[in-house]
Regions:
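Conserved nucleotide-binding/hydrolysis micro-motifs of P-loop NTPases
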Residues: 38, 62-63, 94-98, 120-125, ...
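Canonical P-loop GTPase G-domain recognition
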Residues: 122-177
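Catalytic cores of large soluble enzymes that bind and process phosphate-bearing ligands
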Residues: 33, 64, 68, 95, ...
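Conserved G1/Walker A P-loop phosphate-binding module
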Residues: 1-69, 82-83
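Extended helical scaffolds that flank P-loop GTPase cores
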Residues: 144, 169-247
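Solvent-exposed alpha-helical segments within well-ordered globular domains of core cellular machineries
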Residues: 24, 46, 58, 71-78, ...
Length: 247
């Protein structure tokens, strides 16, 4: 975690979910803009404070998933896993909730504290849609779910309060439990990671990525015993979507 005086928060979400607009509401015009090391993707940082705590905000690129197929996805993964992000604020378009939740389930597997910011709630209300704000957190493992509107600037204090509280409380962990065959393989792979890379944290996420034959993870954490034919990416993806359908 970061220092006692500062909490580092990563804002992440699908493209066009209103993430950057919400980020800018908190940070104003006082932004630090540069490129992520080695790539042309912009890195945008800002700061805010709440109840005497300084909060550094990082606006991560808009992505749909945490694969390693695009530069934006690689940048986001690297930042979350290696740059001491204390809390993840996952901004979602509440009017297209099902489409946005795939990324949420992936983030929960990374072992970091996640807060779901339901943006565009004003649009949900205008369209007469309903979201069960009691059931949704339960189905996502008890993570904070905060309705906000970047456009109307509502729910901002509640979101910052959730950041402080969830920072102290820690991660809720993964909510998707796969079929027994895959769960057994995840457990076996975690044990191998423990043997070969004992200091590696969030081993479940890395184990899942290895079973998906994620090229970047395979390069950094090769396990010779993993068969090249062993690729469970489709099953893992499908079971995530099955879980979302239940929501």
């Amino acid at each position: 975690m970061g220092t006692e005086s500062e909490i580092t928060v990563g804002f992440i979400g699908n493209p066009n979910c209103g993430k950057t607009t919400l980020f800018n509401v908190f940070t104003g015009a006082n932004l630090k803009v540069a490129n992520w090391p080695g790539v042309t993707v912009e890195r945008v940082e800002g700061e805010t404070s709440y109840k005497g705590r300084q909060i550094k905000l990082i606006d991560l690129p808009g992505i749909y998933s945490l694969t390693s197929y695009s530069i934006e996805e690689k940048v986001s993964r690297k930042c979350i896993m290696e740059e001491h992000i204390d809390v993840i604020v996952n901004v979602v378009d509440a009017s297209s909730l099902e489409r946005n939740l795939y990324l949420t389930l992936q983030l929960l597997e990374m072992g970091k504290p996640v807060i779901l910011a339901l943006n565009m709630m004003d649009i949900v209300e205008e369209r007469g849609m309903e979201i069960d704000l009691h059931r949704l957190p339960e189905l996502l493992g008890g993570i904070p779910v905060v309705p906000v509107s970047a456009r109307k600037k509502t729910g901002l204090d509640v979101l910052l309060h959730a950041v402080l509280h969830h920072y102290e409380e820690g991660s809720k962990g993964s909510v998707v439990h796969y079929q027994k065959e895959i769960e057994d393989l995840i457990a076996q792979t975690e044990k191998k990671l423990e043997t070969h890379y004992g200091k590696l944290v969030h081993k479940r996420w890395y184990a899942i990525k290895l079973l998906e034959r994620d090229e970047e993870v395979l390069t950094y954490y090769p396990l010779g015993a993993l068969s090249k034919e062993m690729n469970y990416e489709k099953q893992i993806i499908n079971q995530k979507y099955d879980y979302i359908e239940e929501i």
